[in-house]
Structures are given as structure tokens and as C-alpha cells.
Design a protein with these regions (language model features):
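Bacterial N-terminal signal peptides that target proteins for export
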Residues: 1-6
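Hydrophobic h-region of N-terminal signal peptides that target proteins for export
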Residues: 9-20
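N-terminal Sec/ER secretory leader and immediately downstream segment
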Residues: 22-110, 114-115
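Short amphipathic alpha-helical surface micro-motifs
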Residues: 23-25, 33-34, 43-44, 68-70, ...
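Tryptophan-anchored aromatic micro-motifs
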Residues: 25-49, 123-163
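Beta-sheet ligand-binding and adhesion/scaffold domains
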Residues: 83, 89-145, 202, 206-220
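A eukaryote-biased signal for long
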Residues: 141-244
């Protein structure tokens, strides 16, 4: 009887030691479960770089950690080919995909074919930083100066008064317009009709050409999701104003 008890104890200790050993499949599944968390830092398998993926709102948000001034991408869920969920921008570009088992594939511009991304750590949600009316005014003046210098003509930037809680979105929108313009500034012929930039308040984000103006509509109460992406604004800048 004593030998039986001793054998059972040895077997139990061995099982406990086995549980403490590395188990790649178990660890992978655990990381995949963590990817499903509402907000967290994910790490690219190819470069080791991190990005924050926030799904705490109706639209998901994504920002790369090592580029604090980079654009926060607003992503909308859609069914992915073959199953899972694809998160796409307002121009239809897929940025990240989650499988049914929780695995993540990231599609940055630098790796359009996709790279594996693993959960790294929890993170807080993303929200525009609070701004003052003076900061918004200064950012608008900076944008007007940048566009005027690039196009060799006077450019006016106007914006509708936003509630104090929406000033952060308004400031960020000016930054996003600057990114959009920088991406198409070489298209001087197609930009020759642009003389004004107007930021208006509305119920949903939009951007379009109207005569000599670029009109960008924002919904400040929606946070980052209340403004269009730089890619969407770039398309509007290069569009035919007569088509609106």
C-alpha cells in the first residue's frame, strides 16, 4: 500500500512538472485569446514593432507605437474571405484580420501581403488629446501656410466652431488634411482648382470637392471615428469638383 501511495505522489509531481513546461500550442492559443481583448498592444512577427489595436468603440482604432504623430486609422468590421473578421478603412483597404480562433494578420503599407501579429500587453483606449481654441487656430494657420507654399498661391482654411469636447477632433482633422495633402502634392495640375479648405460639422464624416473648396465634414462627438481618413481626403482632393 505504501508503495502504491508513493507511486501516485511521484506521478502527480511529474504531471505538475509537465504542466509547467513550455507548450507552444497552448501558449499560442493563449495569445490568440488575448488578441480578442478589447484593447491591447500587438507585435509584428517580422519586425518586432508594436501597434495599438482598440476595439472599445463601434469602430476599431489602430496606431503604431513608434510613430506618435502618425494617423490613427479608423477601421470597420467586415466578413473576411474564408471566415474571420476583416477590419477595413473608409476607402476599403483591409488593415487587420482576426481569424475565428483569434489569430491576427496585420496588413501595413510596408507589408501588403500581411504579417502575423501576436498580443503583447493590454492597453488603454485611444482618444484625441484635448485641445484649446488657440491650438486649433494655430494648426489651421500652419496648414494654410504649408499648402500655400507648396501650391504657390494663397489658400484659406476655415472651420466651424466646435464644442470644447470636440476641439481635439478638429485639431486632429487639420493634421489629417495635412497628411492627405502631402501625399498628393505632386499632382499640382489636379490641385490647381483648390483655393479653400472648409471643415464643417455634421452627423457623419465626409470629404468632397465643391467648386474651389475642399470640404471636410466631421462629427466631433464620435472621436477619431468622426473624421475621414487621410486616404479618403486625398481622393477628394484629386476628384472632379463637378461630380459632387
Amino acid at each position: 500500500m505504501t508503495r502504491w501511495i508513493l507511486a501516485i505522489l511521484i506521478a502527480a509531481l511529474a504531471a505538475g512538472a509537465a504542466l509547467g513546461m513550455q507548450n507552444p500550442l497552448r501558449d499560442r492559443l493563449l495569445r490568440n485569446e488575448r488578441v480578442q481583448q478589447v484593447s491591447g498592444w500587438l507585435q509584428r512577427a517580422d519586425t518586432g514593432e508594436f501597434f495599438l489595436f482598440d476595439r472599445s468603440g463601434d469602430a476599431a482604432l489602430l496606431r503604431e507605437r513608434d510613430a506618435p504623430d502618425s494617423e490613427v486609422l479608423v477601421l470597420y468590421p467586415d466578413r473576411a474571405p474564408g471566415g474571420g473578421t476583416a477590419f477595413i478603412t473608409d476607402t476599403g483597404r483591409e488593415v487587420i484580420r482576426l481569424t475565428g480562433l483569434g489569430g491576427a494578420t496585420y496588413f501595413p503599407s510596408s507589408a501588403p501581403d500581411g504579417v502575423i501579429a501576436d498580443f503583447a500587453s493590454p492597453a488603454g483606449s485611444l482618444a484625441p488629446a484635448p485641445r484649446s481654441p488657440e491650438e486649433v487656430r494655430q494648426r489651421a494657420e500652419l496648414l494654410a501656410g504649408e499648402m500655400a507654399a507648396a501650391l504657390d498661391r494663397s489658400i484659406s482654411v476655415e472651420y466651424a466652431p466646435a464644442p470644447r469636447a470636440g476641439l481635439g477632433v478638429q485639431y486632429d482633422t487639420l493634421h489629417i488634411i495635412a497628411i492627405a495633402f502631402d501625399g498628393v502634392r505632386a499632382e499640382r495640375r489636379r490641385l490647381r482648382g483648390v483655393q479653400d479648405v472648409r471643415i464643417e460639422l455634421g452627423e457623419a464624416p465626409a470629404a468632397y470637392r465643391q467648386d474651389a473648396a475642399l470640404v471636410v465634414v466631421i462629427a466631433p462627438e464620435l472621436g477619431y471615428a468622426g473624421r475621414p481618413s487621410s486616404a479618403f481626403i486625398s481622393e477628394a482632393l484629386l476628384s472632379d469638383p463637378g461630380a459632387t
